[in-house]
From Swiss-Prot:
The gene is rplE. GO terms for molecular function: rRNA binding; structural constituent of ribosome; tRNA binding. Pfam families: Ribosomal_L5, Ribosomal_L5_C. This is Large ribosomal subunit protein uL5. GO terms for biological process: translation. One of its GO terms (cellular component) is ribosome. Keywords: Ribonucleoprotein, Ribosomal protein, RNA-binding, rRNA-binding, tRNA-binding. This is one of the proteins that bind and probably mediate the attachment of the 5S RNA into the large ribosomal subunit, where it forms part of the central protuberance. In the 70S ribosome it contacts protein S13 of the 30S subunit (bridge B1b), connecting the 2 subunits; this bridge is implicated in subunit movement. Contacts the P site tRNA; the 5S rRNA and some of its associated proteins might help stabilize positioning of ribosome-bound tRNAs.
Amino acid sequence: MAKLHDLYKDTVVAELQKQFGYKSVMQVPRIEKITLNMGVGEAISDKKVLEHATNDLTAISGQKPITTVARKSVAGFKIREGYPIGTKVTLRGERMWEFLERLISISIPRIRDFRGLNPKSFDGRGNYSMGVREQIIFPEIEYDKIDKIRGLDITITTSAKDNEEGLALLSAFDFPFKKKV
């Protein structure tokens, strides 16, 4: 079992229950899923690009991603409805906890010019989204084997009711948020 999951069950639940005054442990916010999304606009002209992006996301997540398609045609972007334009994967359970552990302890410290995550990136319902400019911050990606540096979006979906609860939950896992000056 992942260390972060044990930390959550053993200490974080008790801390948050005390901090927010919950009567039941079931009211304590928890991480429900982590979604990784890689939009690949170049896939319109070259199908191999989408294949490389899928391989990168598979290596990062340990799970096969699905291909996302355009919902409607946009002439300005030269895309038609149904064109494959990206790839995404949703992590839950054990894989989610292991990915979160690798993200916090290994990948985030490898980001160039990193000064902390923006605490304002919550959506109003306790879910946190962040963008990564380079997929090479993940140790599973070998620099020599990638065709191009791509970014990806990471969304952490929680059961928190508001941003304050979500921030408290992720801070309990030692997420490196920027400190208010």
